[in-house]
């Protein structure tokens, strides 16, 4: 375990929409089994939930959706808790408030998405994970390196099983994204809009914004 680097903090803010320019990676290797449990970010409905903001003053389509949806409202409240806790830390990034305002603008752009609810949900889950991963003093998981059939860029996965949504950070060259556990009939699967990562019997099949990769974990790559 290592302290999360500042490099990941910059890259993750672009993760939700970042798309790579060219493909990457080759060959074969070994098995690094990581078995995430199913995410549990949103509690089951037990009654009305109001978000952290006044729904009578909702200023965007995204906020109106949050006010009408239990799961989104629960995510909004969780984000408000995580953000307030980070903002109160003496070592909090000086631009944290500005970044949060930037995130709100990004969330509100979900009106352009084909699946608006999925877009808003992923925005919340991603922002919560960003704040937790980049929290001062937070421990980051060691990266697992892979050899892929296209070797033009390095490919790694870092797993954060102690965080709310048990996310992973997928890195392909200079592009990064936060992805989340998804149901799988067998093996392990993570994903988000535009990305799918499936690992079964030691081999990973990846779709990274349209780039298809077949990868094998590199033995003894925990300190990459």
Tell where the protein language model's regions lie, with residue ranges.
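Bacterial signal peptide processing site
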Residues: 17-20
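Central antiparallel beta-sheet cores of small beta-barrel/beta-sandwich binding domains
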Residues: 163-191
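Post-signal peptide N-terminal segment of mature Sec-exported envelope proteins
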Residues: 25-52
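Tryptophan-anchored aromatic micro-motifs
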Residues: 139-154, 190
